[in-house]
């Protein structure tokens, strides 16, 4: 999510390049670009990563938009119950910069002016992005609203039923971290699970995904696909993950 924070039309560009590379792309609800624009930019398989931000009614409208746009799967995210306390962001002044308060942003002005090319691109792309795929009563959700919105959007097993009914297609759960949850996902008709700890960016003491991968694979017993993210930096990491599931 939020690729647009780092590059103009970031999600559109990423999806387009994924298509050129012949691989798939998963678009986060927390994208700075409209899901329709992102899907239109690529011919690659595209999945929509769903957060329940804004509540059930907002999510249902987003699901309908994703269906109409041609996304082929919903990836329901369960590994982000709160916004993580990221120490680097505390030190680098992210909160102050996102506040859009001129007084708190003033100390960072020299750094901004030292990057005129970036600054012009940032303003040219509309400045601080919002979330056009989370449309609330007063318009798209603002960037500073993420924390409170996440705290009110915790996913439960009961949510799977209405999400599946509304979507009608492939449903994947991202953030499964123990075998019991993986087994329950299978029993409830989920098509795949993603073993993920959100890069340990939400809870830094959680177990690495490669350590819990064998437990998840054993629990699903080959009945659904198992994907894994986090910690893969080179080809040897892929070999290790594949080896662990065959022990």
Where are the model-predicted features located?
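Active-site entrance/lid segments in N-terminal catalytic domains of soluble metabolic enzymes
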Residues: 1-187, 199-202
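Charged helix-capping and loop-helix junction motifs
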Residues: 10-13, 208-212
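Short, conserved beta-strand edge motifs with alternating hydrophobic and charged residues
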Residues: 172-174, 194-196, 225-229
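Hydrophobic, well-ordered secondary-structure elements that form the walls
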Residues: 193, 241
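Short glycine/serine/threonine-rich phosphate/pyrophosphate-binding segments
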Residues: 203, 235-238
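Extended C-terminal subregions enriched in glycine
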Residues: 213, 218-221, 225-233, 240
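Conserved small/polar residues in nucleotide/adenosyl-binding loops
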Residues: 245-247
């Amino acid at each position: 999510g939020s690729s647009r924070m780092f590059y103009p039309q970031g999600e559109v560009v990423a999806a387009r390049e994924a298509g050129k590379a012949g691989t798939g792309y998963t678009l986060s609800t927390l994208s700075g670009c409209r899901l329709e624009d992102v899907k239109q930019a690529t011919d690659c398989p595209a999945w929509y990563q769903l957060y329940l931000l804004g509540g059930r009614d907002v999510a249902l409208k987003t699901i309908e938009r994703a269906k109409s746009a041609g996304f082929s799967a919903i990836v329901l995210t369960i590994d982000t119950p709160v916004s993580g306390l990221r120490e680097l962001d505390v030190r680098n002044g992210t909160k102050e910069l996102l506040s859009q308060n001129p007084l708190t942003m003033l100390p960072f002005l020299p750094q901004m002016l030292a990057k005129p090319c970036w600054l012009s691109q940032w303003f040219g792309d509309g400045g601080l992005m919002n979330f056009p795929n989370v449309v609330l009563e007063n318009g798209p959700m603002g960037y500073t609203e993420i924390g409170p919105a996440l705290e009110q959007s915790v996913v439960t097993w009961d949510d799977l039923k209405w999400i599946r009914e509304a979507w009608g297609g492939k449903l994947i759960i991202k953030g499964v971290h123990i075998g019991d949850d993986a087994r329950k996902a299978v029993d409830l008709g989920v098509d795949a699970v993603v073993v993920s700890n959100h890069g340990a960016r939400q809870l830094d003491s959680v177990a690495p995904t490669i350590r819990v991968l064998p437990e998840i694979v054993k629990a699903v017993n080959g009945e659904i696909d198992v994907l894994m993210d986090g910690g893969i930096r080179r080809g040897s990491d892929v070999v290790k993950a594949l080896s662990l599931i065959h022990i």
